[in-house]
A protein has these predicted regions:
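Conserved glycine(s) of the Walker
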Residues: 21-22
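Short internal beta-strands
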Residues: 46, 146-149, 174-180
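Inter-motif core of Ras-like GTPase G domains
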Residues: 129-152
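Phosphate-binding/switch loop-helix module in NTP-utilizing enzymes
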Residues: 86-128, 135
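N-terminal phosphate/diphosphate-binding loop that engages ATP/GTP or pyrophosphate donors
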Residues: 4-5, 9, 25-96, 100, ...
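C-terminal lobe/tail of nucleotide-utilizing enzymes
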Residues: 2-6, 164-231
């Protein structure tokens, strides 16, 4: 097992300010970038994916971007049909989610890979089960947090709440990535970057333009994360 992130983490938890704001987009870009830097064993993990009627789309994108050998049902061990929070989806299908199963799967992936990119379903405090939420899971798996901020009106509050709550629980926040997931040039969206630089207290890792997907942008983000090893 290698700890490539700050010398003490094998994985990164990619979470966000909301659902549908580009977490998978950022996670797949990072996976591709790790490969481009010569790290050939990149693991990906989305413990729970909801809104699945066939193959879990996000898990498949993650698997393909990392060129990993795990089957999709390992990348996403829990899938549910309804596009709702994991805890609710699991209750509706009477299939409880176990943190033990998630941890065992994470460790299995970790034995075969140098780094693991883990993606949440929704935000950091979305309930997974009676055992807790993604913040609890991050603590259990010893994962630092990368926050994807969807650039739109209201994102300042969502981002600051996520960052400050994570830090109050003792989680390390590596920084945040701004993602223009919509073509929104409203004053509210434009001021998000300025406000977060002033008040977030964590590093700004990069800004992704609408529909942008490039190794260059991924490297810009990843270099800042890996540069933290000297901190």
């Amino acid at each position: 097992m290698k700890n490539l992130i700050k010398g003490r983490y094998q994985g990164i938890l990619v979470t966000g300010t909301d659902t549908g704001i580009g977490k998978t987009h950022v996670a797949t870009m990072l996976a591709k970038t790790f490969l481009a830097t010569g790290i050939t064993h990149v693991g990906v993990f989305k413990p729970i994916e909801t809104g699945v009627t066939g193959v879990p789309a996000d898990a498949l994108k993650l698997k393909e971007s990392a060129e990993c050998c795990e089957e999709v049902n390992i990348v996403a061990p829990y899938t549910f049909k309804e596009p709702v929070a994991p805890w609710i989806a699991a209750k509706k299908e009477n299939r409880p989610i176990s943190f033990d199963v998630i941890e065992k799967t994470y460790n299995y992936i970790g034995e075969k890979h140098d780094v693991i990119i883990v993606e949440t379903a929704g935000g950091l405090f979305v309930p997974i089960s009676e055992q807790g939420n993604y913040a609890d899971l991050a603590k259990r798996l010893n994962l630092p947090i990368l926050v994807v901020v969807g650039l739109r009106l209201g994102a300042i509050n969502h981002a600051l709440l996520t960052i400050q709550a994570a830090r109050s629980l003792g989680l390390e926040v590596l920084g945040y990535v701004l993602n223009e997931f919509e073509t929104d040039d409203s004053p509210g969206a434009i001021t998000v970057e300025e406000a977060l630089r002033e008040f977030s207290g964590v590093p700004f890792l990069g800004k992704i333009a609408h529909n942008e997907f490039s190794i260059e942008k991924g490297r810009e983000i990843l270099d800042k994360v890996l540069d933290l090893t000297a901190a």
